[in-house]
Amino acid sequence: MKQWSAHTDDIKALMRTLRGDTPNVMKAFSGLAQAALTPQALDAKAKELIALGISVAIRCDDCIGFHVKAALDHGATREEVIEALGMAIYMGAGPSVMYATHALEAYEQFKPEAATPAA
């Protein structure tokens, strides 16, 4: 079982390195992310649930961790996450079923009641 909190921390550290090595590219990426995530017709929670569904459908584990955490931070419930995963499975078929289990595991580890494993 993947430890999602530690995994996303590792990716954040690598992204900081990448930001130092390719500042122009990462600045442009950050601008794109900020523009896409700014609430307009959809609120931040809905956007993160969409991003989570896409993460599952395209099989991006690293994306799953970040978007599960962000969805929770914006108040997503387990039921909302499950519904988003259902849409990802519908759009991505069998492989999305497997990656939906990754997202569910990440949800269980990131939710506030989850105990943090000892390092």
Regions found by a protein language model. Give the residues of each.
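Acidic, glycine/proline-rich low-complexity segments that act as flexible tails and inter-domain linkers
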Residues: M1-A46, Y99-A119
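Amphipathic alpha-helical segments within well-ordered protein domains
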Residues: A33-Q34, A51, V68-L72, L85-G86
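Immediate flanking context of iron-sulfur cluster ligation sites
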Residues: A41-I58, E79-L85
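Short cysteine clusters
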Residues: C60-C63
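Iron-sulfur (Fe-S) cluster-binding segments and ferredoxin-like electron-carrier domains
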Residues: F66-R78, L104-Y107
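C-terminal structural segments of small proteins and small subunits
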Residues: I82-E108
